[in-house]
């Protein structure tokens, strides 16, 4: 199914927060394979964090909406719910940051994530002039890291600790959480 893309506006913030939470936390997230429910409790993000992305220069929240949602799981899903989203941020040195990547849990594994990632890479390269896309992923998410590696990302060797003690980022269920940085060159991808 094809996706239509647009950038989030302030009115979209509640729906974006709900989508991100459903993809990563709680029992509902177990419908997809991106769940962090075994690693973290609490929130994944909040309205203030998403609003900051929407309002800040050089940052954007890309939204994906399914075109002709004829196969919606319920009528409510066909009526204005998001298929997925991701944060894009222009950084110095021709780099773009990719984060808060979420796909509706009941629709994961159907190619929507690949479409969203490809559009984010295109925007970063063509509209932001980025030569490289970078992201942070929980080191304990081996299956997710492998998914990104199959799409051309590689580990940079950089890591940072999880922000323990700050419930805004979730409540850890284990003491060894950390993030690894992944990177992918965006230039020269479509030369042929």
Pin down the residues of each PLM region.
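Conserved GNAT-fold acetyl-CoA-binding loop/helix
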Residues: 21-50
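Conserved beta-strand in the GNAT
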Residues: 63, 79-90, 97-102
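A short, internal acetyl-CoA/4′-phosphopantetheine-binding micro-motif in the GNAT/acyltransferase core
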Residues: 65, 101-109, 137-139
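A conserved beta-turn-beta hairpin within the catalytic core of GNAT-like acetyltransferases
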Residues: 90-101, 108, 127-131
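Conserved acetyl-CoA pyrophosphate-binding loop and the N-cap/start of the following alpha-helix
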Residues: 107, 111-119
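C-terminal "cap" of GNAT-fold acetyltransferases
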Residues: 129-146, 151-192
